[in-house]
Amino acid sequence: MSDTLVCFDSNLQRNVVVKTLKPGIEKQRLMDELSALADIRSKYVVQVLDVIKKDGDVVGFVEEYIDGNAITPIANPASSDTILRYLYSIAAGISDVHDHGRLHRDIKPENMRFDYGGTLKIFDFGLSKLNTSAKTKTLYFTPGYSPPEIFSAGVDGNHNFTEAVDVFSFGVTAYWILNGGSIPADFFKVPPIVPPTSSLFDALAVVSEKSVSVLLDSCLCAEPSNRPAMREVKSLLGDYILKGQHKMLLTYNGQRSTIDINKPNVSLTVGSNGISISYNGLGFVVSNVTGFVRINNKQVAAGHRIKGSVVIVLGDPSGGIKTSITADVSHPEVMH
């Protein structure tokens, strides 16, 4: 699609990548990549540094040079934390792409690399599209990493792409990482043969957290609507990386108490109204409710997960009995 050259930027005092359009290549693909990278701000996505113009026309751009190692399969045995952090970086990058209304459309190991500081970066957005325009009559795909639905054109002759395409490609990439660089032979067929539900990650038995294996397997579902959103994958992986590190601060009448891994359970009661909250290492969950209880003015039931800052009300205000308790949940960050 483009000619790529590594150059030294004397102003930035570092190497950069210069991408210019190859003769005879569709300019729109270069513009799609530039547009995508200019829109997205993420520590896990390569950044555009400058635009190159000739006679007022864009002919190329400058992006950061990723000078670290290519991604490789994880050598077994590996710690659960190593696996979770590896996959989290990829999931977070794709999630950020989707949060900016973009699709990557070519997620695979070759399009990722670690920078000098060890942060994984996703690059090569030449096939990237806005969610609202992610369709094409000409099908570009990478064998092994593309889901079955893109091989069937719609009545308008277009091949339609959704976020679920990137989710499937993430699932294959994750499997490649955990399975010694190998993926199922059926995935290379055109179209790929994908079972309705996957148990590939569960069979690997390298991820100790069952819910993580289940979620990763769901990324490889044949039906796109059964695949999770990347922000859901990012969230669960992050929760397990930070397991046991969360805190909830409860404040009532100037008095404070904390729920954390050392004190994981609390019960708050006013008359016949009460709520029990438990910390399971991943988050704070309502375990029991009696009488009139509201969280941020909404009725709550057992199983509800409390996030952020909320106000817990015990007692019906119309009955003259009301106690308000503030709850603040900490937001620890995944550090590399």
What are these regions (language model features)?
Residues 221-246:
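Terminal C-lobe "cap" of eukaryotic-type protein kinase domains
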